[in-house]
Amino acid sequence: MNRGQADMKQPLLKLEQVEICYRRTPVVHGLTLEVAPGEILGIVGESGSGKSTVIKGIIGLLGNEGAVTEGKIYYKGEELLHGTPEELRNIRGPEMGMVFQNAGASLCPIRKIGDQLYEAVLQHERVSRTEVRRRAMELFEKMKLSEGS
């Protein structure tokens, strides 16, 4: 199979018995689902029910306090939970991302903006940390923010 092309016979996305923990506390239990190529999936639920946590687990944005601790996640037949950050970026590519339902809550208020921007760019682009830092500094200057923001 060519990377980046989904086989119409296999799921585009597949989760098998996924468990996600935050600070060692399980918050998502035994999640199993399949999304076929061309299929649309909507995740709905009450506030705090784990919608964003599931998406962050799939795309690898749980941060230092969260982790997928059980199960398997596949995208186009390739496992997303193992491999180097570079290998995982290549699998996910620019196709995976997250759209926040509340733009005001998109950034974590207790973490530095710069750290959050660095993580997002490093997660999805094939650039060096030096290049990420350079781009972030340009953005900070345009927004009249200091690097420590």
Where are these regions (language model features)?
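Conserved ABC ATPase "signature" region
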Residues: 131-149
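Q-loop/switch helix immediately C-terminal to the Walker
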Residues: 102, 109-123, 135
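Helix-to-loop junction immediately C-terminal to a conserved catalytic motif
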Residues: 59-63
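The feature captures the beta-strand-to-loop junction immediately N-terminal to the Walker
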Residues: 44-46
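ABC ATPase NBD coupling module
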Residues: 80-97, 123, 129
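ABC ATPase nucleotide-binding domain
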Residues: 14, 32-34, 74
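Conserved ABC transporter NBD signature motif
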Residues: 67-79
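Conserved structural motif at the start of ABC-family nucleotide-binding domains
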Residues: 13, 28-30, 91
